[in-house]
Regions:
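Conserved NTP-binding/hydrolysis module of P-loop NTPases
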Residues: 122-142
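The conserved phosphate-sensing helix
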Residues: 258-271
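Helix-loop-helix "sensor" segment of P-loop NTPases
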Residues: 203-254, 271-274
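A short beta-strand-to-loop transition that corresponds to the Sensor-1 phosphate-sensing loop
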Residues: 197-203
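Walker A/P-loop nucleotide-binding motif
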Residues: 85-102
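A short, basic N-terminal segment
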Residues: 4-84
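Conserved catalytic segments around the Walker B and adjacent sensor/switch elements
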Residues: 109-121
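Conserved Walker B catalytic segment
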Residues: 149-197
Length: 278
């Protein structure tokens, strides 16, 4: 009992209030822990039209919710505006927000060619044909050489910001991707465009040094710190409430300890926390 009293004396009052209220509420079997009125007050939750913490990747119209990725977005914007063609690898662990970054990039260019479905058969020919259709037209040439030459000619004749071509295949192994991009890269490097391939460090590790040397590889997308977690909360809450959520430092520290600051983990953590009040 004495040890419990000492422990309780070191806890913030808000956390104690949540713990005490949960002792009095018996959760339903198979459900999230119920959150009482005192829980809600302790967490300072505002009125919300919906739960803003969705685990889906951010889409184009949700780019304002992207947090902690300012540097990579600025670099891409600069290359597109100054018409500086290049091949890039956007590197990040699973859950770091690679796909969300690529979706948000759609705001940076008037023409974005996304590739997210990996072809099961002859992926090199299929991906090149799909690119050709979107760049040059529906009558795909019979040979790869003619196909590439016509894509190059079509892009050379354009003015304005460069098109952005992205590849995002998180479910494909690094060795298989390496084989595909060994053959694709000589074609991609001739296109007057920004080409971005999203890879996990594990996928990138399977690429040869020669292949990697053709690309500008970003530093891995970092996990979020406490300041960025608060910015993430603010950005999400603005989409569903006219009020902010004054989440306590203790709550944010708890979320960081549970997730390591990985964006996908943080989103699920706060989603479940808010769902628990329903």
């Amino acid at each position: 009992m004495k040890a419990n009293s000492v422990l309780r004396s070191t806890l913030p009052n808000a956390i104690i209030a949540v713990l005490e209220s949960r002792k009095r509420v018996k959760p339903r079997c198979g459900s999230l822990p119920q959150m009482t009125i005192s829980d809600q007050r302790a967490l300072h939750l505002p009125h919300m039209r919906a739960n803003p913490f969705s685990a889906r990747p951010i889409e184009v119209d949700g780019a304002a919710m992207l947090v902690g990725r300012k540097t990579v977005m600025q670099d891409l914007s600069l290359h597109l505006r100054f018409r500086n063609p290049r091949l890039m690898v956007l590197q990040g662990e699973r859950g770091s927000g690679r796909t969300s970054v690529l979706h948000a990039c759609a705001n940076l260019s008037p023409e974005v060619l996304t590739n997210t479905m990996f072809p099961e058969q002859d992926p090199v020919a299929t991906l090149l044909s799909e690119l050709y259709i979107r760049i040059a037209g529906y009558e795909v040439p019979a040979t790869t050489g003619m196909l590439v030459e016509q894509m190059v000619a079509s892009l050379e004749g354009r003015s304005g910001d460069l098109p952005l071509i992205t590849f995002d295949f998180p479910g494909v192994g690094g060795e298989e991707l390496a084989q595909v991009f060994e053959r694709l890269t000589p074609c991609l490097c001739r296109l007057k465009a920004i080409v971005v391939v999203a890879l996990t460090p594990a996928q990138l590790a399977a690429w040869s040094e020669d292949l990697i040397s053709s690309y500008d590889v970003t530093v891995p997308l970092p996990d979020l710190n406490a300041k960025e977690v608060r910015a993430l909360i603010d950005a999400r809450m603005r989409t569903v409430s006219h009020e902010g959520w004054a989440a306590s430092d203790a709550l944010i520290d708890e979320a960081l300890a549970a997730t390591g600051g990985r964006p996908a983990g943080l989103i699920r953590h706060f989603r479940d926390l808010i769902d628990a009040q329903r």
